[in-house]
Structures are given as C-alpha cells and as structure tokens.
A protein has these predicted regions:
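Glycosyltransferase-associated regions of secretory-pathway enzymes
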Residues: 135-145, 153, 168-169, 257-287
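Intrinsically disordered, low-complexity coil segments
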Residues: 55-59, 114-117, 136-139, 153-159, ...
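Mg2+/Mn2+-dependent nuclease catalytic core
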Residues: 123-237
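Metal-dependent nuclease catalytic cores that hydrolyze phosphodiester bonds in DNA/RNA
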Residues: 1-144
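Hydrophobic/aromatic-lined pockets within catalytic cores
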Residues: 19-24, 166-169, 196-200, 244, ...
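Alpha-helical structural motif
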Residues: 11, 99-103, 187, 232-239
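Polybasic (Lys/Arg-rich)
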Residues: 230-277
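Helix N-cap / beta->alpha transition motif
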Residues: 96-97, 225, 272
Length: 288
C-alpha cells in the first residue's frame, strides 16, 4: 500500500517557492489534451515540449539525424516524448491540472494586486534565504537562522524579518490559532535576536505573508505584535538555557523532564478541565 501524494502539499510547496521566486509562476503549464494512444497525439506533445524548450536560453537542442514523424516506431516516439518532458521538468517546468492552474493564477493575482502591490514593495532589495551563524552570549551555544527574507531600513524604513507561511486555515482567526499552536513566536523571536546580534542592526519588525492553499486562495500581509515577539524571545532564551543544562549534564531527557524533581520520572497526571463537566441528568421513564 502506497500513500498517494496530497495535492495540497504540492500546492503549498509551490506557493512558498513561487513567492520567493515569482518566475516560477510562469513555469507551471497545463499540457494539451492529446490522445496518447495515437502517433498523432504523441507527435503533438513532442511539438508542445519543443516549443517550451525553444524559449529557454540555456537549452541546446541535440542534433538529430531524423525529425520525429509518423514513420517512427510508436514506442520510440513515446520514449522521445518522455525525454523531452523530463528535460522540461529539469529546467523547472511543472505540469498541472486545469483546476490547479486556476488556483495558482488566483495566488499569482493576489501576489501582484494585494494592498496595491505592497508585497513587491516590501521585497524590493530584500535578501532571500540567507543563513546567519553566531554564538549566544549567555550560553555560548552556536546558533543559526535562515529567514525566508529580510530587508533593511535603507530600503523600507525598518530592519525587518519577512516570513512566508502557507496554510490550510480557511480564515485569519484559524491561522492565528495555528501560529500559537506551532509556537511561531519562538522562531520569529529567534530570527530577530540572532540576526540583530550578528549584524549589529536592530531587527525589531516581523512581517508575515500568509498564503492560503484552500479556498478562497487568498493572501494576507501580517505585522507581528511586539508583545508576541517579546514572548517568543523569552521562550527562545529559556529553551537555550535548558539545552545548555543538557549538554553540561550530558543528559537529554524525554517526558521524564515533566516530572517533579526527585520523582524519578513519575508524572502527576491530571485530566484537562473540560473533562470535569458534571453528568447531565437522564430520565429513563417506565411506561409499563
């Protein structure tokens, strides 16, 4: 039994990459509906792939002794078609369904139109996927961050971390809930702390660009609350102190860390509050 790939995961991955590199929007194509059980249909696909490859400056077509035609063996034609298709994929093309194309076009439209083009303005002059390596001053632990984007005050007036998040949340409230559940404040706080320490610049703004991979396939640009980021920085430094203790004691506990000191890993268990609801009265009438 093989689990099928989930289309929403592919869309999420593509959307994330395309907002980092908008040219990818132009590399998603819907293949023509040609009968692949006939030589004419296979030849039509060969012409289609050749037209795509002809647009690529880095592609050098192989010198051929013979041009594909109906005179070729059918299996040889199909192998030739498959090689061309794979070459397109190697050059960055993705082939998708008509429905998926409509979704991607919606994301593309929102990318360019949202807030009068604010996303492009925020990313003008920004650096993408740059790693920052440093050492925490308090714990002396090595640290590294790799934000999706960052921009500086000379370009946009502030030193900002810019994060992209794809989501299956159907509204902003659900997305905020997911951010808290996944502790995004910790990672965003860590980005600011590490980048500020290494560069000497005060990165104190985080802008998050949300990309929906479910209807209505919308986009939102979110300015993170300073209070939430301060909370995240506190959690980050607290986590570093725990990691330092683990290294010093050469002991990396699991759930036994939840037990009280001296309890030897035995955890006091308590059910959540919602389980304490009173039983509702039930009337069982005797109609005899």
């Amino acid at each position: 039994f093989e689990e099928k790939e989930k289309p929403h995961f592919q869309l999420g991955t593509f959307a994330h990459m395309a907002f980092l590199e908008p040219r990818l929007f132009e590399l998603v194509k819907v293949e023509p509906n040609c009968n692949q059980a006939s030589k004419e249909g296979v030849l039509a696909m060969i012409r289609y792939y050749n037209e795509l490859l002809a647009k690529e400056a880095g592609y050098v077509k192989e010198v051929e002794d013979d041009i594909p035609s109906v005179n070729w063996n059918f299996n040889v034609l199909k192998e030739y078609r498959d090689r061309l298709r794979q070459t397109c994929i190697d050059l960055g093309y993705s082939f998708i369904s008509e429905e998926m194309s409509m979704i991607i076009n919606a994301l593309k439209r929102n990318y360019y139109w949202y807030g009068g083009g604010i996303i492009q303005q925020l990313l003008k002059g920004a650096c993408s996927e740059v790693s920052f390596y440093g050492r925490d001053k308090e714990t002396q632990l090595d640290v590294r961050v790799r934000p999706d984007y960052f921009n500086i005050e000379e370009n946009i007036g502030v030193n900002a971390v810019i994060s992209f998040k794809t989501t299956r949340a159907d509204d902003l409230g659900k997305f905020y809930y997911d951010c808290a559940k996944l502790k995004y404040e910790l990672s965003e706080g860590m980005y600011q702390e590490v980048m500020s320490s290494i560069t000497g610049r005060k990165f104190n703004v985080t802008i998050m660009i949300m990309l929906q991979t479910v209807e209505p396939y919308d986009v939102a640009v979110l300015f993170w609350s300073p209070d939430d980021l301060a909370n995240g920085k506190y959690k980050y430094h607290y986590a570093l102190s725990i990691v330092k203790d683990c290294f010093e004691k050469k002991w990396f506990p699991g759930y036994d860390a939840k037990a009280e000191e001296g309890a030897r890993g035995i955890i006091d268990m308590q059910l959540p509050e919602w389980s304490h609801k009173l039983l509702h009265p039930v009337a069982i009438d005797d109609f005899e």
